């Protein structure tokens, strides 16, 4: 029995999958106290993913490793990476071991962990959409250029000090970093919210993550 238990019951979607959860992706979700986390959980559930959800103060990296998830999601949140509980510790624990996906604060946490600077954005974005320009690879494979994505953030990973270990995979027309990946490890992040109803092709981004290793 682990010291930490999931905040929500394990989400088991699909009667045919019951009894053999290893047939599907098991996703560990680190919830940074954000309402958008539920939307992400719902979307991944629609894709048939079993999930274990913990708030960022409910589980340690060692306990998370013992759960042996297939993938890790670091959720959005209202704070900075330094204030995001165990989020940075989860990146350290799982980097190179399991695929990691960071959304908004999770994306910023990846940038921060690998040496980037997370700074105040020139523009406060609260429920606004921007066209996204991307490299048509990994998370963005098969997506049209300039698809609209919803943004809720006042911080972003600074382009001028972007860490060498990471690569920019998406941006706005103004050059703001909207997507990143590690150059050699299975780690990806997006600054915008793929789970927002106003984001185009959000479900496809999540599907693409599930196909990456």
What are these regions (language model features)?
Residues 26, 50, 70, 99-101, ...:
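Structural signature of beta-strand start/N-cap positions in the alpha/beta core
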Residues 18-25:
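Short, Lys/Arg-enriched N-terminal segments with co-localized hydrophobic residues
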Residues 12-13, 20:
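Intrinsic-disorder-associated, low-complexity terminal segments enriched in Asp/Asn/His/Tyr and depleted
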Residues 138-184:
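Catalytic beta-strand/loop cores that center a nucleophilic Ser/Cys/Thr
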Residues 196-213:
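Acyltransferase
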Residues 25, 69-142, 206-207:
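Cysteine-nucleophile active-site neighborhood
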Residues 28, 35, 47, 53-55, ...:
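A generic "structured core" feature
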